[in-house]
Amino acid sequence: PAIVANPQDREARSEALYGAWLCGVCLGSVGMALHHKLCHVIGGAFDLPHADTHTVILPYAMAYNAKAAPHADAAIARTLGGRDGTSALIELAGRLGSPRSLKSLGMPESGIDRAADLAVQNPYWNPRPIERT
Protein backbone atom coordinates (compact mmCIF):
# COMPACT_ATOMS: atom_id res chain seq x y z
CA PRO A 1 0.00 0.00 0.00
CA ALA A 2 1.10 3.54 -0.77
CA ILE A 3 0.92 4.66 2.85
CA VAL A 4 3.33 1.89 3.86
CA ALA A 5 5.76 2.72 1.07
CA ASN A 6 5.69 6.41 1.98
CA PRO A 7 4.10 7.25 5.35
CA GLN A 8 4.40 10.98 4.55
CA ASP A 9 2.18 10.67 1.44
CA ARG A 10 -0.68 13.00 2.34
CA GLU A 11 -3.00 11.69 -0.36
CA ALA A 12 -2.50 8.09 0.78
CA ARG A 13 -3.03 9.10 4.40
CA SER A 14 -6.17 11.01 3.44
CA GLU A 15 -7.52 8.00 1.55
CA ALA A 16 -6.75 5.73 4.53
CA LEU A 17 -8.58 8.11 6.85
CA TYR A 18 -11.55 8.20 4.49
CA GLY A 19 -11.52 4.39 4.35
CA ALA A 20 -11.52 4.21 8.14
CA TRP A 21 -14.47 6.59 8.25
CA LEU A 22 -16.35 4.44 5.71
CA CYS A 23 -15.69 1.40 7.89
CA GLY A 24 -17.21 3.21 10.85
CA VAL A 25 -20.29 4.11 8.81
CA CYS A 26 -20.65 0.46 7.81
CA LEU A 27 -20.40 -0.71 11.41
CA GLY A 28 -23.36 1.48 12.25
CA SER A 29 -25.42 0.18 9.34
CA VAL A 30 -25.02 -3.60 9.37
CA GLY A 31 -25.21 -6.57 11.68
CA MET A 32 -21.97 -7.76 13.18
CA ALA A 33 -20.97 -11.30 12.35
CA LEU A 34 -18.51 -13.99 13.42
CA HIS A 35 -15.39 -11.85 13.08
CA HIS A 36 -16.60 -9.13 15.40
CA LYS A 37 -18.06 -11.61 17.88
CA LEU A 38 -14.80 -13.57 18.11
CA CYS A 39 -12.70 -10.43 18.50
CA HIS A 40 -14.78 -9.14 21.39
CA VAL A 41 -14.94 -12.52 23.11
CA ILE A 42 -11.25 -13.32 22.70
CA GLY A 43 -9.98 -9.79 23.25
CA GLY A 44 -12.08 -9.29 26.36
CA ALA A 45 -11.60 -12.72 27.92
CA PHE A 46 -7.86 -12.85 27.35
CA ASP A 47 -6.99 -9.14 27.51
CA LEU A 48 -5.63 -9.04 23.96
CA PRO A 49 -5.02 -5.78 22.03
CA HIS A 50 -8.15 -4.78 20.12
CA ALA A 51 -6.81 -3.88 16.66
CA ASP A 52 -4.25 -6.69 16.57
CA THR A 53 -6.92 -9.23 17.54
CA HIS A 54 -9.05 -8.05 14.61
CA THR A 55 -6.05 -8.36 12.29
CA VAL A 56 -5.44 -11.97 13.33
CA ILE A 57 -9.08 -13.15 13.40
CA LEU A 58 -10.38 -11.54 10.19
CA PRO A 59 -8.82 -13.94 7.65
CA TYR A 60 -10.08 -16.97 9.58
CA ALA A 61 -13.61 -15.60 9.91
CA MET A 62 -13.56 -14.74 6.20
CA ALA A 63 -12.43 -18.27 5.30
CA TYR A 64 -15.22 -19.74 7.43
CA ASN A 65 -17.87 -17.52 5.80
CA ALA A 66 -16.54 -17.51 2.21
CA LYS A 67 -18.93 -20.18 0.91
CA ALA A 68 -21.90 -18.38 2.44
CA ALA A 69 -20.82 -14.94 1.19
CA PRO A 70 -19.05 -15.54 -2.15
CA HIS A 71 -19.77 -12.04 -3.51
CA ALA A 72 -18.12 -10.40 -0.50
CA ASP A 73 -15.11 -12.71 -0.77
CA ALA A 74 -14.78 -11.96 -4.50
CA ALA A 75 -15.00 -8.20 -3.90
CA ILE A 76 -12.21 -8.37 -1.33
CA ALA A 77 -10.10 -10.52 -3.66
CA ARG A 78 -10.55 -7.98 -6.47
CA THR A 79 -9.71 -5.07 -4.21
CA LEU A 80 -6.58 -6.68 -2.77
CA GLY A 81 -5.54 -8.44 -5.97
CA GLY A 82 -5.69 -12.05 -4.79
CA ARG A 83 -7.21 -15.32 -5.94
CA ASP A 84 -9.65 -15.16 -3.02
CA GLY A 85 -10.33 -12.71 -0.22
CA THR A 86 -8.83 -14.79 2.55
CA SER A 87 -5.47 -15.45 0.93
CA ALA A 88 -5.26 -11.85 -0.30
CA LEU A 89 -5.79 -10.57 3.24
CA ILE A 90 -3.24 -13.00 4.68
CA GLU A 91 -0.70 -11.88 2.07
CA LEU A 92 -1.38 -8.21 2.86
CA ALA A 93 -0.93 -8.82 6.59
CA GLY A 94 2.37 -10.55 5.86
CA ARG A 95 3.64 -7.66 3.73
CA LEU A 96 2.72 -5.22 6.48
CA GLY A 97 4.39 -7.24 9.21
CA SER A 98 1.11 -7.57 11.09
CA PRO A 99 0.63 -10.16 13.82
CA ARG A 100 -0.47 -13.50 12.39
CA SER A 101 -1.46 -15.57 15.43
CA LEU A 102 -3.32 -15.25 18.69
CA LYS A 103 -0.33 -16.84 20.41
CA SER A 104 1.83 -13.90 19.31
CA LEU A 105 -0.67 -11.61 21.06
CA GLY A 106 -0.47 -13.56 24.30
CA MET A 107 -3.43 -15.93 24.08
CA PRO A 108 -2.71 -19.27 25.71
CA GLU A 109 -3.52 -22.44 23.78
CA SER A 110 -5.38 -23.61 26.87
CA GLY A 111 -7.90 -20.80 26.29
CA ILE A 112 -9.20 -22.05 22.94
CA ASP A 113 -12.00 -24.19 24.40
CA ARG A 114 -13.11 -21.36 26.68
CA ALA A 115 -13.12 -18.93 23.75
CA ALA A 116 -15.22 -21.32 21.66
CA ASP A 117 -17.71 -21.78 24.50
CA LEU A 118 -18.02 -18.02 25.00
CA ALA A 119 -18.42 -17.38 21.27
CA VAL A 120 -21.51 -19.59 20.97
CA GLN A 121 -23.20 -18.50 24.21
CA ASN A 122 -25.06 -15.52 22.75
CA PRO A 123 -26.09 -16.10 19.13
CA TYR A 124 -24.89 -13.55 16.62
CA TRP A 125 -26.06 -13.04 13.07
CA ASN A 126 -23.66 -14.68 10.62
CA PRO A 127 -24.00 -15.64 6.95
CA ARG A 128 -23.04 -19.23 7.85
CA PRO A 129 -24.41 -21.07 10.90
CA ILE A 130 -22.08 -21.29 13.88
CA GLU A 131 -22.00 -24.44 15.98
CA ARG A 132 -19.73 -25.62 18.77
CA THR A 133 -18.37 -29.02 17.75
Regions found by a protein language model. Give the residues of each.
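Active-site segments that bind and position negatively charged phosphate/pyrophosphate groups
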Residues: P1-A88
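C-terminal charged capping/lid subdomain of soluble metabolic enzymes
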Residues: T79-T133
